[in-house]
Amino acid sequence: MSYQCPLCHQSLLLARQQWRCENNHQFDCAKEGYVNLMPVQHKKSKEPGDSPEMMQSRRAFLDSGHYQPLQQRVSELLEKFLPEKAESLLDIGCGEGYYTAVVEAQLNKRRNLKIYGLDVAKIAVRYGARRYPAVSFCVASSHRLPFADKSLAGVLRIYAPCKAEELARVVKPQGIVLTVTPGPRHLYQIKELIYQNIHLHPLKAEPLAGFELITDESLSYPMKLDGVQAYHLLQMTPFAWRATEDVKKELADRALFECETDFILRVYQRLN
């Protein structure tokens, strides 16, 4: 399996560190090993994706290990529900590859899967490609996936947006999509610092046309963070845009900040 040209949708072939289609559209491999499949005309800004500051905070927080239970559960669900003869898996919105790399390492203990990581942020993909060479990284839009119809056995989507039509297009029959979304009480204690009134609403499962929901579970646990970790956690979320400087300073000065996680994990299977 190879990439698909984002301009004409023909297959891309790799030769001399360059991906090229039969219409002679060319995409160079970066020295770090990733390929940029985001044409200028598809960009909505000069540097799409998260800011460098948000990515630095995310990297620092994730490296502290507080989201390892989610990392592990994602790997377990993929191992359980991926078809036995699966050959490829795509992580949409992979960022720097925190989840992608562990999925690759865990699944390939007994499989031989090609693992792809896709993100719109070039700086995140560059870092991931440098740190995790076993993963094939690309810069691309999650709304225009550079993969052929029915070419992927599975897709991992943690918080990332993606059109249901695109998922139905690229996932093989009997293939799966694993989504992770924040539950009602996710980071509730951070919300308390920012919002006067918090309303908890139960989340209904997202309908994905062409897929059947086969498992729906939550993962919740408490975290004990120091001030630096709490600050990085805030800065890696959209809550940072609403937080005042006083709130940020209060978090950073904490000796201990207790906060809860609440993740919703759902597995969908592609119908024939």
Language-model features: locations:
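N-terminal auxiliary segments of SAM/dcSAM-dependent transferases
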Residues: 1-47
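A short acidic, Gly/Pro-enriched loop at the edge of an enzyme's catalytic core
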Residues: 143-154
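Conserved class I S-adenosyl-L-methionine
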Residues: 85-95
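Conserved beta-strand signature within the Rossmann-like core of class I S-adenosyl-L-methionine
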Residues: 174-184
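Conserved Class I S-adenosyl-L-methionine
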Residues: 219-272
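Conserved SAM-binding loop of SAM-dependent methyltransferases across substrates and taxa
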Residues: 96-110
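Class I SAM-dependent methyltransferase Rossmann-like catalytic core
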Residues: 44, 49-73, 77
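Conserved SAM/SAH-binding beta-strand->alpha-helix loop
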Residues: 119-121
